[in-house]
Curated annotation (Swiss-Prot):
Compositionally skewed regions (Acidic residues) per UniProt: 429-445
UniProt cross-references to InterPro entries, sorted A to Z: Beta-tubulin_BS (IPR013838), Beta_tubulin (IPR002453), Tub_FtsZ_C (IPR008280), Tubulin (IPR000217), Tubulin/FtsZ-like_C (IPR037103), Tubulin/FtsZ_2-layer-sand-dom (IPR018316), Tubulin/FtsZ_GTPase_sf (IPR036525), Tubulin_C (IPR023123)
Binding site for GTP: 11, 69, 138, 142-144, 204, 226
Name the record gives this protein: Tubulin beta-1 chain
GO molecular function, one term: GTPase activity
GO biological process: microtubule-based process
Stored PANTHER family: TUBULIN
Species in which this protein is naturally found: Gadus morhua
Family: Belongs to the tubulin family.
Keywords of the record: Cytoplasm, Cytoskeleton, GTP-binding, Isopeptide bond, Magnesium, Metal-binding, Microtubule, Nucleotide-binding
Its biological purpose: Tubulin is the major constituent of microtubules, a cylinder consisting of laterally associated linear protofilaments composed of alpha- and beta-tubulin heterodimers. Microtubules grow by the addition of GTP-tubulin dimers to the microtubule end, where a stabilizing cap forms. Below the cap, tubulin dimers are in GDP-bound state, owing to GTPase activity of alpha-tubulin.
Region named Disordered: 425-445
SMART domains from the UniProt entry: Tubulin, Tubulin_C
Entry cofactors: Mg(2+)
Length: 445
């Protein structure tokens, strides 16, 4: 089977990673001891992708848990599914990264990285045919962003032909822990552009807005935000975990979704949006699901898709529904909104259907969009970065760990280049290339 090795780094990465394992263990009928209690062969059909079958028929997540301080790991270990993980796969330091990217990437993190790679190697060796890696982390802190990107580049060195996929939580002033988040995020994006194949941008700004506006939670907690993240992660990995044809592995997903290597930052979406612990009383129809998942308010990145154009889209419907109706609705969306899809990639919307819905819902839909509107997110970070960097505010924390100002300048311009590239393809039309030839032909006539 085609296995995926999961890594989670830093406080945020470990918290959303732990939620992810709770949700998918539940979907696959695996209890906190790793024992299967399911009721459908579909649950076990591709269980090997994320789980290793250990002695005694126990299923153990192919997960490596990393942090530079022991706190979060302890709470994962004592949490609901803490005992399902392999004890040797917890790798942690004591010093912490203090929300400093340089500590995670160059000093503290660099000291721990080899012991993490040993565990990664061991996990990779127990795979039949490893398809790739996925990392959950945030870009605003020190460990997830600094050490997370260090791990990515080290793994890339050792496994250059495997797919590298990240779930990256993008910082926002609305849900802020630290004033230096724009620095950490920009330095991280600088790495992600070069070293990952697919990055799901999970934007705290959007999560907060969804909780506040749609779910009417006046003071959203991290638990509320993480509920949305785990629903999204469960949705986008559905095709990898259950039998099906479309985007059934990370590479096929990348081939469908990434038209240019640097433009691999996806905007995830989910429908229906429900708050934690609530059940859905009315089952949604396929047209409602389709309409909701293309709605900007359902996007997990705070970008308005109507401000850009889709290069590519993948949609995953879950639950018992008519394939014919799904296809009709998806075509309907494209025909009505054709100006929001680039015309120079025909058939750029792909749809998959999985019979098993998420817990508590009869039907759900997950959206993965590669939209040029994602530039809004990078612009937002870039503006905050520039405001501080212009005055060299807080820089001494980074240069003190041996970093050079030059690296900041490079990261800044790499991110600005990324924004321009998205803009360039947003403005591109199918005709542009042909204009010159036509002129030549006219003269001949």
């Amino acid at each position: 089977m085609r296995e995926i090795v999961h890594l989670q780094a830093g406080q945020c990465g470990n918290q959303i990673g732990a939620k992810f394992w709770e949700v998918i263990s539940d979907e696959h009928g695996i209890d906190p001891t790793g024992t299967y209690h399911g009721d459908s062969d579909l649950q076990l059909d591709r269980i090997n992708v994320y789980y290793n079958e250990a002695s005694g028929g126990k299923y153990v997540p192919r997960a490596v848990l990393v942090d530079l301080e022991p706190g979060t790991m302890d709470s994962v270990r004592s949490g609901a599914f803490g005992q399902v993980f392999r004890p040797d796969n917890f790798v942690f330091g004591q010093s912490g990264a203090g929300n400093n990217w340089a500590k995670g990437h160059y000093t503290e993190g660099a000291e721990l990285v080899d012991s993490v790679l040993d565990v990664v190697r061991k996990e990779a060796e127990s795979c039949d045919c490893l398809q790739g890696f996925q990392l959950t982390h945030s870009l605003g802190g020190g460990t997830g962003s600094g050490m997370g990107t260090l791990l990515i580049s080290k793994i890339r060195e050792e496994y250059p032909d495997r797919i590298m996929n990240t779930f990256s939580v993008v910082p926002s002033p609305k849900v802020s822990d630290t004033v230096v988040e724009p620095y950490n995020a920009t330095l991280s994006v600088h790495q992600l552009v070069e070293n990952t194949d697919e990055t799901y941008c999970i934007d705290n700004e959007a999560l907060y807005d969804i909780c506040f506006r749609t779910l009417k939670l006046t003071t959203p907690s991290y638990g509320d935000l993480n509920h949305l993240v785990s629903a999204t992660m469960s949705g986008v990995t559905t095709c990898l975990r259950f039998p099906g044809q479309l985007n059934a592995d990370l590479r096929k997903l990348a081939v469908n979704m990434v038209p240019f290597p640097r433009l691999h930052f996806f905007m995830p979406g989910f429908a229906p949006l429900t708050s934690r612990g609530s059940q859905q009383y009315r089952s949604l129809t396929v047209p409602e699901l389709t309409q909701q998942m293309f709605d900007g308010k359902n996007m997990m990145a705070a970008c308005d898709p109507r401000h850009g154009r889709y290069l590519t889209v993948a949609a995953i419907f879950r639950g018992r529904m008519s394939m014919k109706e799904v296809d009709e609705q998806m075509l309907n969306v494209q025909n009505k909104n054709s100006s929001y899809f680039v015309e120079w990639i025909p058939n750029n919307v792909k749809t998959a259907v999985c019979d098993i819905p998420p817990r508590g819902l009869k039907m759900a839909a997950t959206f993965i969009g590669n939209s040029t509107a994602i530039q809004e997110l990078f612009k937002r970070i870039s503006e905050q970065f520039t405001a501080m960097f212009r005055r060299k505010a807080f820089l001494h924390w980074y240069t003190g760990e041996g970093m050079d100002e030059m690296e900041f300048t490079e990261a800044e311009s790499n991110m600005n280049d990324l924004v321009s590239e998205y803009q360039q393809y947003q403005d591109a039309t199918a005709e542009e290339e042909g204009e010159f030839e036509e002129e030549g032909e006219e003269e001949l006539a």
